[in-house]
Amino acid sequence: MSIILGIDPGSRITGYGVIRQQGRHLQYLGSGCIRTSEKELPGRLKQIYAGVTEIITQFQPDVFAIEQVFMAKNADSALKLGQARGSAIVAAVNADLPVHEYAARLIKQAVTGTGGADKVQVQHMVQHMLKLPAKPQADAADALGVAICHANTNKTLVALAGKATSARKGRYR
């Protein structure tokens, strides 16, 4: 059993989603958005760090998963996104959490079955997969998608590691 904190970073709105993974079962624990109010970027980064730290304290996750930076057309936006990610990652590292990063296309693939899915499709599938009564906010749904992606990727890696161990045992008898 592990608790996974997923983060969809943004310099103005950072989504978060927390799930519990028990084998193949995923249970929704919480989600929402950290909305920054500061006008200047350093103040927003401080709010992101404080918000993620508070979420870590509240939910006590075992692992931290975050969306990777994608190359945006606007370099300034990409830099701000990278700084927002950094603030969230520092909060995780300060809490001694392992950090895992996933590309947006991989996250969408894990949740919807296609890497080109839009936000509405992600919201719908997250609601369905976690049996939520209503669609989560877009940024929170994306963050839950990050957590779901980690859970699915982690299950696959554990299964592959087990098969590799079994194969090695059989080979050296």
Swiss-Prot record:
Highest taxon, organism lineage: Bacteria
UniProtKB keywords: Cytoplasm, DNA damage, DNA recombination, DNA repair, DNA-binding, Endonuclease, Hydrolase, Magnesium, Metal-binding, Nuclease
GO MF annotation, one: crossover junction DNA endonuclease activity
GO biological process, one term: DNA repair
Enzyme Commission no: 3.1.21.10
One GO location term (cellular component): Holliday junction resolvase complex
Cofactor(s) the record lists: Mg(2+)
CDD domains xrefs: RuvC
Subcellular location: Cytoplasm
Its job: The RuvA-RuvB-RuvC complex processes Holliday junction (HJ) DNA during genetic recombination and DNA repair. Endonuclease that resolves HJ intermediates. Cleaves cruciform DNA by making single-stranded nicks across the HJ at symmetrical positions within the homologous arms, yielding a 5'-phosphate and a 3'-hydroxyl group; requires a central core of homology in the junction. The consensus cleavage sequence is 5'-(A/T)TT(C/G)-3'. Cleavage occurs on the 3'-side of the TT dinucleotide at the point of strand exchange.
Protein name: Crossover junction endodeoxyribonuclease RuvC
Organism: Vibrio campbellii (strain ATCC BAA-1116)
Gene: ruvC
